UniProtKB/Swiss-Prot annotation:
The lineage of its organism: Bacteria, Pseudomonadati, Pseudomonadota, Gammaproteobacteria, Enterobacterales. Gene3D superfamilies: Leucine Aminopeptidase, subunit E, domain 1 (3.40.220.10), Zn peptidases (3.40.630.10). Mn(2+) 2 binds at K270, D275, D293, E354. It comes from Salmonella arizonae (strain ATCC BAA-731 / CDC346-86 / RSK2980). HAMAP family: Cytosol_peptidase_M17. GO terms for biological process: proteolysis. This is Probable cytosol aminopeptidase. Its main location: cytoplasm. Its cofactor is Mn(2+). GO terms for cellular component: cytoplasm. It comes from the Bacteria. Binds 2 manganese ions per subunit. Keywords: Aminopeptidase, Cytoplasm, Hydrolase, Manganese, Metal-binding, Protease. Presumably involved in the processing and regular turnover of intracellular proteins. Catalyzes the removal of unsubstituted N-terminal amino acids from various peptides.
């Protein structure tokens, strides 16, 4: 699907369809008023007859409106004008895309980007429209024999901006939106892939392909179990002992800033391609969804793709910590004591608290890069789902400015996060009689104690932890990976690169 931006009046548009908004109760948006005027009140007469109230989600497709050059006009209900916020704006765009796709409108000029969304500029509205359109049209059908496609799918969308001065920011918004959407799609595709296909070796192959596609700025190194043993990554290795699939850590390095002094931002993704729970095995109900336990690694991969596509002038390293947690004769056990790469020892009380064991060694490994900041992304705890539900990602950090940056980026991108504390009081829950720490701290504050565990391996740099257990995928009829928090991290890196969307 193609996107472009232009500046023009609605009466001059020769298009298959023009898209304009209508507010409650039966109030035309400024652009719709212009079309109504040139059509001698045709549109307002329809509204007076009760054809459209303007409630969110309502649509009315008009054909051959008098004096209008376009073949059709699509009226979209936007709700009450003063209540149009970011969430409702994206829902309006989603409804628009679905309606155009279902009605065979192969191209359209969209004036919805001229609607007023409080605190948001045209760059934001165009970029969010692109990202929402791509999200709406996403489907995972690679493994289906019969693929359903619309007879006349939407192929081209033109966004209208009020003045020619805003064309440049509109074009940049499309460029950024497409790159972020492609990163989200890549993350969703990886997340949705079944575990008999997507194992640690598959993650490594995707990382290598990324380096091949962007070879001027990206290199990938894959570290196998033999090298992990030499490095002393015993906690990481222990988690994968029960699986016949080798644990592999893929390190993707992007160099956009040639300066010797430019320190990288490191992203670490938990990549448990299937988590049975190990010896502390999970209940069978819903266990199929444990293929999504690698969505942290999938998100990091998607972000690295975005960075390479936009050639951001910063250095970023993405680590995909690939592994599989299975029961078996070689599997690690409750009661085992593991010596981590940092030298600290961990008593295993539950083999289903495995993600932190993988991550702790990776967080030690990345010290060698002397990072500007390290952000790990993990479907880490069910406790975070209880705390924040399925709408907001949990954030913990040992550095207030980094936490504030990430929270700001989450609001900008509409991919929200909420900060949880990392107090010393919670560290006490990790005490062990037999090792430096236990790998679980009991039920109270489970998401926080998991973050506290990781914080013990991050004392040499600024670090943040994103717990995406509640936001990485959906269950039920709409089951599938969400691609979060690709948008949040993309915005964070765009801000670091000087593209904050404030033009």
């Amino acid at each position: 699907m193609e996107f472009s931006v232009k500046s023009g009046s609605p009466e001059k548009q020769r298009s298959a369809c023009i898209v304009v908004g209508v507010f409650e109760p039966r109030r035309l948006s400024p652009i719709a008023e212009q079309l109504d005027k040139i059509s001698d009140g045709y549109i307002s007469a329809l509204l007076r007859r009760g054809e459209l109230e303007g409630k969110p989600g309502q649509t009315l497709l008009l054909h051959h409106v008098p004096n209008v050059l376009s073949e059709r006009i699509l009226l979209i209900g936007c709700g009450k004008e003063r209540e149009l916020d970011e969430r409702q704006y994206k829902q309006v765009i989603q409804k628009t895309i679905n309606t155009l796709n279902d009605t065979g409108s192969m191209e359209a000029v969209c004036f919805l980007t001229e609607l007023h969304v409080k605190g948001r500029n045209n760059y934001w509205k165009v970029r969010q429209a692109v990202e929402t359109a791509k999200e709406t049209l996403y489907s995972f059908d690679q493994l289906k024999t019969n693929k359903s496609e619309p007879r006349r799918p939407l192929r081209k969308m033109v966004f209208n901006v009020p003045t020619r001065r805003e064309l440049t920011s509109g074009e940049r918004a499309i460029q950024h939106g497409l790159a972020i959407a492609a990163g989200i799609k890549a993350a969703k595709d990886l997340g949705n892939m079944p575990p008999n296909i997507c194992n640690a070796a598959y993650l490594a192959s995707q990382a290598r392909q990324l380096a091949d596609s962007y070879s001027k700025k990206v290199i990938t190194r894959v570290i196998g179990e033999q090298q992990m043993r030499e490095l002393g990554m015993n906690a990481y290795l222990a988690v994968g002992h029960g699986s016949q699939n080798e644990s592999l850590m893929s390190v993707i390095e992007y160099k956009g800033n040639p300066s010797e002094d430019a320190r990288p931002i490191v992203l670490v993704g938990k990549g448990l391609t299937f988590d049975s729970g190990g010896i502390s095995i999970k209940p069978s109900e819903g266990m199929d969804e444990m293929k999504y336990d690698m969505c942290g690694a999938a998100a990091v991969y998607g972000v690295m793709r975005m960075v390479a596509e936009l050639q951001l002038p910063i250095n970023v390293i993405g680590v995909l910590a690939g592994c599989e947690n299975m029961p078996g004769g070689r599997a690690y056990r409750p009661g085992d004591v593991l010596t981590t790469m940092s030298g600290q020892t961990v008593e295993v009380l539950n083999t289903d608290a495995e993600g932190r064991l993988v991550l702790c060694d990776v967080l030690t490994y990345v010290e060698r890069f002397e990072p500007e900041a390290v952000i790990d992304v993990a479907t880490l705890t069910g406790a975070c789902v209880i705390a924040l539900g399925h709408h907001i990602t949990g954030l913990m950090s040992n550095h207030n400015p980094l936490a504030h940056e990430l929270l700001g980026a989450s609001e900008q991108a509409g991919d929200r996060a909420w900060r949880l504390p990392l107090g010393d009081e919670y560290q006490e829950q990790l005490e062990s009689n037999f090792a430096d720490m236990a790998n679980i701290g009991g039920r109270p504050g489970g998401a926080i104690t998991a973050g506290c565990f990781l914080s013990r391996f991050t004392r040499k740099y600024n670090w943040a932890h994103l717990d995406i257990a509640g936001t990485a995928w959906r269950s039920g009829k709409a089951k599938g990976a969400t691609g979060r928090p690709v948008a949040l991290l993309s915005q964070f890196l765009l801000n670091r690169a000087g593209f904050n969307g404030e033009e």
